[in-house]
Amino acid sequence: KEENYFFKLSKYKDRIIEHIKKNPDFIQPEFRANEVLNQLEHIEDISVSRSKESVSWGIPVLGDDSQIIYVWIDALSNYITALGYDPETPSEMFKNYWPADVQVIGKDILKFHAIYWPAFLMALDIPLPKTILAHGWITIDQTKMSKSIGNVIAPKDVMETFELSHPDAFRYFMMVTAPTGRD
């Protein structure tokens, strides 16, 4: 156990549940929304920092050099900071592109994007993305593709084999052929 800063996630539980129920397209496919609703029933407040002793790198907590910002706070905030989010004077990019129409994510990080991220946005009074699309894993012989297992296919190799001139062609292929609801 260590001393950390916490975000009162429980304060936003009912609002997130209400948002999911009032916006049936918010989490797709629908069965993923049901998974999130089940997770919300048992949600607890979350630690948003880590001791500098346990994590040697990261963004320091302002005013407390003993703490580092939890990596998911940093990672999720990139969606809006990359667009120039500023509560005082939001950039034109932020005004034009937020809220996102669709955020495409893997099913293994659904909790972070469909529970934590909406709560953080609600706390800042920022609109939520319109849809979170959680895709399944890409598998080979019913096994998740994984660099650690060594069963991945490098996108660069696919592009060279099929003479694709731009990475967007490969991305498009994956979007239209990969199943969104299952592995």
Locate predicted features:
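Structured secondary-structure scaffolds
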Residues: 1-183
